[in-house]
Amino acid sequence: MKILSVENLSRAFGGIKANNNISFEVEEGTILGVIGPNGAGKSTLFDLITGYTKANAGKVKFFDKDIFGLTPDKISNLGIGRTFQKLKPFADQTLLENVMIGSFVKEGNIKKARDKALEIIDFVDLIEKRHHFARELSTGQRKRLEMARAMAIEPKLLLMDEVTGGVDQKTIPGLVELIKKLKKSGVTIVTINIILILLWRFQIIF
């Protein structure tokens, strides 16, 4: 079953075409890799799909629902999660509080949100850091936090932007294993990440 369909998606900034008639489909339960040189519009593509930037033209469907033009919160509520290349945690809140923001939106109950957040934090192997402020975490730990925050909405589809970018070589294998575990849990993944693409050799788009 197709979980995501993108058709002729385009966005220009002035005279610069960031994305020009991009079309692709993602099957549920798979991983799709997006590759291209710096400045090719890969992150912008994620912004267009998730509503953070408005497209000039095109169609985006999540399963059979048209999500083109919807706001990020509505797209998120449908089950599309997103991580960012530039990490955006709430620096003065704890790891637990960061994840609870998303889980509370999903659960609507403080206790359930806390329990769900702790479950996710344990999943990303940060349970011992749950009471640490986000600003105290290493880059690799903040990458895991970014994934945990995206997982808090229980996404069916997760768009991952350079999840291993900016970390040292020793940290990368652990992040790769975490992504493997995430896929096994049933989440469909679209990733901008050359390391994962080389390791797994899954379907790619340019």
Regions found by a protein language model. Name each.
Residues 158-161:
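Catalytic Walker B motif of ABC-type/P-loop ATPase nucleotide-binding domains
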Residues 112-129, 177-180:
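Conserved ABC ATPase "signature" region
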Residues 35-37:
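The feature captures the beta-strand-to-loop junction immediately N-terminal to the Walker
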Residues 58-65, 78:
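Conserved ABC transporter NBD signature motif
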Residues 133-137:
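Conserved ABC ATPase signature
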